[in-house]
């Protein structure tokens, strides 16, 4: 299903004008959402990774879209992305039945999403474009700062809720995973941005058709397995 969705998006991206078309921003959002879902999935579980990855990927895609066009982050924009991130954190932690921690972490994420950009620590400061992955000390420092902020915020929330060892372990794991995700994304994002802006739209169309075919084959595997099982 994921292959079908991304295949349809890339094909539509080609048909509707590429980087100058209406789907350019949406394509970036999908690219970063998929990347962050996969990164969070390494340690945080499927439901948590899906909720947080989609929300944070959407916010990141919007940040980079504006940065690429030279549009500054307005107060209204920062407020919108802060709400998106905080709601996602609340929902993801709420599912784990730690309700007070969910509200505290959501509030902290909301505040940090508004404060950090004022200190020049935001996804927009990581924006870059190039033909290959890039790594600079600036990326390392920003990823490290955001990881420490995430861990400290989680521990603060755990202390307020009088969390046990399991809760403390969870918030530390989230903070480390978040920092790792920011670090990896900052390395590969120049490559993603360059190809998004410079590849001919026809390449996305070809990729879209390929993903459609892959998605069809994957979904057809259970049917083929059933048919072969019946013929035995």
Region locations from a protein language model:
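Alpha-helical transmembrane segments and immediately adjacent membrane-interfacial amphipathic helices
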Residues: 1-14, 28-193, 203-227
């Amino acid at each position: 299903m994921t292959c079908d969705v991304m295949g349809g998006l890339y094909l539509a991206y080609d048909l509707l004008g590429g980087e100058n078309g209406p789907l350019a921003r949406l394509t970036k959002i999908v690219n970063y959402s998929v990347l962050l879902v996969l990164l969070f999935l390494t340690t945080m579980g499927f439901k948590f990774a899906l909720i947080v990855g989609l929300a944070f990927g959407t916010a990141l895609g919007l940040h980079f879209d504006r940065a690429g066009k030279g549009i500054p982050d307005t107060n209204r924009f920062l407020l919108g992305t802060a709400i998106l991130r905080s709601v996602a954190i609340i929902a993801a932690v709420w599912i784990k039945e730690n309700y007070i921690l969910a509200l505290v972490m959501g509030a902290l994420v909301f505040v940090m999403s508004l404060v950090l950009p004022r200190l020049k620590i935001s996804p927009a400061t990581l924006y870059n474009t190039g033909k290959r992955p890039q790594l600079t000390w600036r990326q390392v420092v920003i990823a490290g700062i955001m990881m420490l902020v995430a861990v400290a915020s989680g521990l603060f929330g755990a202390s307020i809720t009088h969390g046990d060892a399991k809760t403390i372990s969870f918030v530390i794991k989230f903070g480390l995973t978040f920092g790792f995700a920011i670090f990896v994304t900052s390395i590969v994002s120049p490559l993603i941005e360059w190809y998004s802006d410079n590849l001919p739209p026809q390449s996305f169309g070809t990729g879209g058709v390929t993903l459609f075919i892959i998605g069809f084959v994957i979904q057809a595997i259970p049917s083929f397995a059933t048919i072969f099982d019946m013929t035995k």
